[in-house]
Structures are given as C-alpha cells and as structure tokens.
Amino acid sequence: MRTRKEKDFISCFDSRTGVYYRTGILVNGKETEDDPFMASFPELLDIGIMGHCRHGQSGLCLQSGIQCYQNGLNRADANMRVEDFRRIISECRENTYQVALGGCGDPDQHEAFEEILKICRDAEIVPNFTTSGLGMTRETAAICKKYCGAVAVSW
C-alpha cells in the first residue's frame, strides 16, 4: 500500500488490488468530508508512447469500419524512446500511482512494450492501457498479466 500525505488530505493506493482512496480535507487530524479539489501532482498520468499504428496504416481499421481519432491511417511518427519514458517515470515515481499508456496505436505493439511495463513496476507505478487486441498474442497476454493493472480491449 502506497500512501501519500498532501497538505490537507491523504491518498492511498494498493498496487496489487487497484483499491484507491482519498480522505476528505483534514482539519486538526479530523475528517471534514469536504472533497479536496486536486492533488499537487497527478496520481494517474496518461503517457502517449505510440507514434504510429500498424493496424491503421494497413487499412485494417478502416476495413473494419473503425474511424481512428488519432489519424492512424496517415500518422507515421516514431514511438516514444525507452530513455524518454524512463525519464518521465523517474520524475513522477514518488507521486504517481498509475499510468495509462496510449498514443497513436496499440501500446502492446510498441517495440519495447515489456521493458516499458517493467520500468513502471520497478518504480511502483501500475501500468494500464487500452488496445484494439488486433496484435495481441499469447505471449503479450502473459506479459500483460505479469505487469498490468488493467487492460481494456476496445474493438
């Protein structure tokens, strides 16, 4: 269980179960039941690790009737470098409980996917992501089971 004390409240996160809770504003150590507006640093961070989508570029999504809000048919940017991801995680590791991996393409298709998940877990941050599932393999599913908190398949 990770616990973080802010000026007026306390938040806790269990990385094994995903249970999260935050107290209301505390005055003289007593719960007021007033909601704190926000933490001083994001407890959940969205990180776009994908710069392109191989399924979108192949036309598979279009054939399936799926319109990509990330313009996956035409985008051809590089995926995030592992060094850049590692730096982001090192800068937020003391304050962030979870990350949502995303970008233009399925995060599980990133060339360093397992390493990215391991970097998160080594920093006690739980990685989560949404995928089309089009490139999911048994090996990738096993990696997700080992490292991820939640994986959503959006077809």
What are these regions (language model features)?
Residues 30-37, 67-70, 120, 124-131:
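Short charge-dense sequence patches
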Residues 1-46, 63:
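Flexible, acidic/Gly-rich N-terminal and inter-domain linker regions that tether
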Residues 36-83:
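Canonical Radical SAM [4Fe-4S] cluster-binding loop centered on the CxxxCxxC motif
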Residues 82-104, 109-155:
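Radical SAM/AdoMet-radical enzyme domain recognition
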Residues 25, 31, 55, 110-112:
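Residue-level recognition of conserved structural "scaffold" positions that shape functional pockets
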Residues 25, 70, 155:
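Active-site donor-binding loop signature of nucleotide-sugar glycosyltransferases
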Residues 20-21, 69, 85, 113:
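Aromatic side chains
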